[in-house]
């Protein structure tokens, strides 16, 4: 199931990206010889007078073959023969569609799931199944003290347990059904986050959002993720983060497996993050990527002529570097899975 979810998610993101290129190319009457979903050997195809629509064996990936994309090629009404502004729109359309998809997903999830508002009172709303205190505490218990330290609001619990993280057991004063009770609770170590926990969660309520509120949520969330993504790429290329910490396609499968345990909203959220990441990646000014091609179009728009032979060589070199980069990350992902 994890494999299927990952394939569908990545396939959808790439399909939407290529659809942007395809629709704008058709809008400007550029000949499109093929629109492919997937990579590798062709499994099924539908031929029309102008375009072949194909499905290929490897379900991840896809491409749009717009005639005239090769630097220096001369095709009637081809990509290279069109005005610079039209070429810019076609190149940017894939990224735009990724961003639009992310925004729509954020809006839909906000509209359906609403906003979760947590109760600030130190009243237990849930217990971790199989947790050390599942049989000791009960939902609706109000925690008054932990090891003699007063608890006024929910956030006080984590502050106090942090101070007591060297202990294995602590005393607790709780209010249950209007009566106060003294209990002995066990602290469980959360190694991943370097803390101790009681295995409890607060009460919360779902608040439905209006269309305007959902749009506002989508806008703010999109901007936040976009800024974080740009900062992330800057950190990678500035050498502040080791490539060993970067995940590629293989690593994404592992993340999907973990996220899918928490339901469709978490899967949709991951899809949003990946869609924005792929959009930003394609905007990077690297030859062979959309961003690299856009740079050359912008130079043309401001009157700077670039030697076509050099441009062609740069795009080929950029593609080789990109494939090498993806290979390195994928090998690292596989290494991490086995270690």
From Swiss-Prot:
Cofactor field: Zn(2+)
E.C. number(s) listed in UniProt: 3.4.24.-
Keywords per UniProt: Cell membrane, Hydrolase, Membrane, Metal-binding, Metalloprotease, Protease, Transmembrane, Transmembrane helix, Zinc
Gene Ontology biological-process entries: proteolysis
Pfam families named in the record: Peptidase_M50 (PF02163)
GO-annotated cellular components: plasma membrane
Keyword Cell membrane: yes
UniProt KW Zinc keyword: yes
Chain positions recorded as Zn(2+) binding sites: 17, 21
Localisation per UniProt entry: Cell membrane
Class in the EC hierarchy, top level: hydrolase
Stored InterPro entries: PDZ_sf, Pept_M50_Zn, Peptidase_M50
Active site: 18
Positions of transmembrane segments: 88-110, 262-284, 318-335
Membrane topology recorded in Swiss-Prot or TrEMBL: Multi-pass membrane protein
An annotated Gene Ontology molecular function: metalloendopeptidase activity
Domain PDZ: 96-179
SUPFAM superfamilies the UniProt entry points to: PDZ domain-like
Family in the record: Belongs to the peptidase M50B family.
UniProt-listed PANTHER family: MEMBRANE METALLOPROTEASE ARASP2, CHLOROPLASTIC-RELATED, REGULATOR OF SIGMA-E PROTEASE RSEP
Protein name, entry field: Putative zinc metalloprotease FN1322
Source organism of this protein record: Fusobacterium nucleatum subsp. nucleatum (strain ATCC 25586 / DSM 15643 / BCRC 10681 / CIP 101130 / JCM 8532 / KCTC 2640 / LMG 13131 / VPI 4355)
């Amino acid at each position: 199931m994890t494999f299927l979810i990952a394939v569908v998610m990545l396939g959808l993101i790439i399909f939407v990206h290529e659809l942007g290129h395809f629709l704008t190319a058709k809008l400007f009457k550029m000949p499109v010889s093929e629109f492919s979903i997937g990579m590798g050997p062709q499994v099924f195809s539908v031929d029309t007078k102008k375009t072949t629509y194909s499905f290929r064996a490897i379900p991840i990936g896809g491409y749009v073959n717009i005639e005239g994309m090769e630097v220096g090629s001369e095709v009637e009404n081809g990509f290279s023969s069109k005005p610079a502004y039209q070429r810019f729109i076609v190149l940017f359309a894939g990224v735009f569609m990724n961003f639009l998809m992310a925004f729509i997903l954020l809006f839909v999830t906000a509209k359906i799931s609403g906003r979760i508002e947590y109760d600030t009172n130190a009243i237990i709303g849930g217990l971790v199944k199989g947790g050390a205190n599942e049989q000791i505490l009960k939902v609706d218990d109000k925690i008054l003290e932990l090891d003699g330290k007063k608890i006024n609001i929910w956030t006080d619990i984590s502050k106090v347990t942090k101070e007591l993280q060297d202990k294995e057991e602590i005393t607790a004063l709780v209010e249950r059904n209007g009566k106060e009770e003294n209990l002995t609770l066990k602290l469980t170590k959360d190694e991943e986050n370097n803390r101790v926990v009681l295995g409890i969660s607060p009460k919360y309520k779902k608040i439905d959002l209006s269309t305007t509120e959902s749009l506002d949520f989508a806008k703010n969330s999109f901007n936040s993720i976009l800024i974080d993504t740009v900062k992330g790429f800057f950190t990678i290329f500035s050498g502040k983060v080791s490539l060993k910490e970067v995940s590629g396609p293989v690593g994404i499968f592992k993340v999907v497996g973990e996220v899918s345990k928490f339901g469709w909203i978490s899967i949709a959220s991951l899809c949003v993050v990946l869609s924005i990441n792929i959009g930003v990646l394609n905007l990077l000014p690297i030859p062979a990527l959309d961003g690299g091609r856009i740079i050359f179009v912008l130079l043309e728009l401001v009157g700077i002529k670039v030697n076509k032979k050099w441009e062609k060589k740069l795009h080929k070199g950029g593609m080789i570097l990109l494939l090498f980069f993806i290979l390195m990350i994928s090998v690292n992902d596989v290494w991490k899975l086995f270690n």
